[in-house]
Swiss-Prot record:
Subcellular location: Cytoplasm; Secreted; Cell surface
Residues binding Mg(2+), per UniProt: 242, 287, 314
Residues where (2R)-2-phosphoglycerate binds: 163, 339, 368-369, 390
CC cofactor note: Binds a second Mg(2+) ion via substrate during catalysis.
SUPFAM superfamilies from the UniProt entry: Enolase C-terminal domain-like, Enolase N-terminal domain-like
The protein's required cofactors: Mg(2+)
UniProt name for this protein: Enolase
HAMAP family: Enolase
UniProt keyword annotation of Cytoplasm present: yes
Any one Gene Ontology molecular-function term assigned to this protein's record: phosphopyruvate hydratase activity
C-alpha cells in the first residue's frame, strides 16, 4: 500500500488550441503520474459531460477552470489518503462523489484526469511500464492501427461528408512494419493529391482534407496511393471508414443529408449505399454508419453486412456498458470504439472492453480529435490486448506520440510481442 499524498490540476492546451485538464498525482513512496485529458469534436449526446466554463471572455467560453477547481478543491481532498494501487476504489469514490450518471457535477475531464494520473503514479512507483501495470504480464498484443489519412465531416473544412477514411495495414508481420506501411501510403497519397491539383493541408487528426467530388472518390484516391506505395489493397491493406452519420442526420425528416454529394437518403437507401461500397472496395470496418439514435437503422445495417464488415459503435455506445449491453442484446453492431473520456474512468473503460470481448465484439481503443502528447491509450490498447487502435494519421505530434509509444512497447516486449493484423477481426467471416 502507498498513499496518495498530493493531487494537482492545471489548465493546459490541446492540439486544437482549446483548454483541457492536466492532473498530477504524487504518492508517499515517491510515485508520480501525470495525465492530459483529450476532448472530442463530434460527440455523442450520451457521452459523459466535458465540463467547460462558458465564460465567453476566456478561450471563447471553452476554459476548464471549473474542472480544474473541482480536482483541486473537491476531489483531491477526498482521494488523498487512498491507496494508489486501488484503481477501482479511487474511480468508484469519484463516481459516488459526483453523484450523476454522466459525471455532470464535477465533469468527466476532471475525474478522468485523476483516474489516469493515479494509474501512472502506481506504475511509476512499482517501476513498471503502464501497460504491464494495467494488464499484467499477459499484455503483449500490439494493436492493428486504423490510420486516418483523409479527413472530412466535422474534422475538416471540405465537402466530404464522411468524417474519416482510414487504412489498416493488416498484412504486416509486426507493428513496426505496419507503421512503416502506413507512413509510406500517407506520403504516396500526398503525391497523388498534389498531382490532382488538390489541397494537401491536414485536418484535426493529421489526415489530408481535400475537396473531392464524392465520398467514393476519397476511397479511389486512397487505393491509388496504396498501389503507388507498392502494396496490395485487400491483402496488405484494408480500408476503414468513420462515417459519423449523426453529423449529417436530419432528425426531423428522418433522412441522411449527404450535402457534399447532393443526396438525401433514407435509412434503407444509406444501408444499401454502404453494401454497394463494401462489395466494390476492400472495406473492412465502418463506424457509426447510422445516427446514434437510429437503432433500427443499425440493426438493418448489421443484418445486411455485419457478417463481413466490422461495424463499430462510437456515438452509438459511447464506451458505456449499459448502452453496449443493449446493443449486444439486440444484435446491433459487432464492435465498440473505446474512448476514455466518453465514460470518464479507467475502471469503466476496462469494463466496456471486457464486456465487448465476452460477447464476441471487437474493441477499438481510440483517441479524440482534440488530443495532447499523452500516450496513455497506447498502453491501454496493449494492456487489454484490444487488438485495434485508432489514433489518427501519420502526421502531427499529438497523433505520432501514440504510435511512437507503441513502437517502444513492441521493442520492450521483444520476442513476446504479437501483432495480429487480420486476425484482430476475429468475428468476421470475410
Amino acid at each position: 500500500m502507498s498513499m496518495i499524498t498530493e493531487i494537482y490540476a492545471r489548465e493546459i492546451l490541446d492540439s486544437r488550441g482549446n483548454p483541457t485538464v492536466e492532473v498530477e498525482v504524487y504518492t508517499e513512496d515517491g510515485g508520480f503520474g501525470r495525465a492530459l485529458v483529450p476532448s472530442g469534436a463530434s460527440t455523442g449526446e450520451h457521452e459523459a459531460v466535458e465540463l467547460r466554463d462558458g465564460d465567453k471572455s476566456r478561450y471563447l467560453g471553452k476554459g476548464v477552470l471549473k474542472a480544474v477547481d473541482n480536482v483541486n478543491e473537491k476531489l483531491a481532498p477526498e482521494i488523498i489518503g487512498y491507496d494508489v494501487f486501488d484503481q477501482a476504489g479511487i474511480d468508484k469514490k469519484m463516481i459516488d462523489l459526483d453523484g450523476t450518471k454522466n459525471k455532470g457535477n464535477f465533469g468527466a475531464n476532471a475525474i478522468l484526469g485523476i483516474s489516469m494520473a493515479a494509474a501512472r503514479a502506481a506504475a511509476d512507483e512499482l517501476g513498471l511500464p503502464l501497460y504491464t501495470y494495467l494488464g499484467g504480464f499477459n499484455a503483449k498484443t500490439l494493436p492493428t492501427p486504423m490510420m486516418n489519412i483523409i479527413n472530412g465531416g466535422s474534422h475538416a473544412d471540405n465537402n466530404v461528408d464522411f468524417q474519416e477514411f482510414m487504412i489498416m495495414p493488416v498484412g504486416a508481420p509486426t507493428f513496426k512494419e505496419a507503421l512503416r506501411m502506413g507512413a509510406e501510403i500517407f506520403h504516396a497519397l500526398k503525391s497523388v493529391l498534389s498531382g490532382m491539383g488538390l489541397n494537401t493541408a491536414v485536418g484535426d487528426e493529421g489526415g489530408f482534407a481535400p475537396n473531392l467530388k464524392s465520398n467514393e472518390e476519397a476511397i479511389t484516391v486512397i487505393l491509388e496511393a496504396i498501389e503507388k506505395a507498392g502494396y496490395k489493397a485487400g491483402e496488405d491493406v484494408y480500408l476503414a471508414m468513420d462515417v459519423a452519420s449523426s453529423e449529417f442526420y436530419d432528425k426531423a425528416a428522418g433522412k441522411y443529408n449527404l450535402a457534399g454529394e447532393g443526396k438525401v437518403l433514407s435509412t434503407e437507401e444509406l444501408v444499401e449505399f454502404y453494401a454497394q461500397l463494401v462489395d466494390k472496395y476492400p472495406i473492412i470496418s465502418i463506424e457509426d454508419g447510422c445516427d446514434e439514435n437510429d437503432w433500427d437503422g443499425h440493426k438493418l445495417l448489421t443484418d445486411r453486412i455485419g457478417h463481413k464488415v466490422q461495424l463499430v459503435g462510437d456515438d452509438l455506445f459511447v464506451t458505456n456498458t449499459e448502452k453496449l449491453a443493449e446493443g449486444i442484446e439486440k444484435g446491433i453492431a459487432n464492435s465498440i470504439l473505446i474512448k476514455v473520456n466518453q465514460i470518464g474512468t479507467l475502471t469503466e473503460t476496462f469494463d466496456a472492453i471486457e464486456m465487448a470481448k465476452k460477447a464476441g465484439y471487437t474493441a477499438v481503443v481510440s483517441h479524440r480529435s482534440g488530443e495532447t502528447e499523452d500516450s496513455t491509450i497506447a498502453d491501454i490498447a496493449v494492456a487489454t490486448n484490444a487488438g485495434q487502435i485508432k489514433t489518427g494519421s501519420l502526421s502531427r505530434t499529438d497523433r505520432i506520440a501514440k504510435y511512437n509509444q507503441l513502437l517502444r512497447i513492441e521493442d520492450m516486449l521483444s520476442d513476446v510481442a504479437v501483432y495480429d493484423g487480420i486476425k484482430s477481426f476475429y468475428n468476421l467471416k470475410k
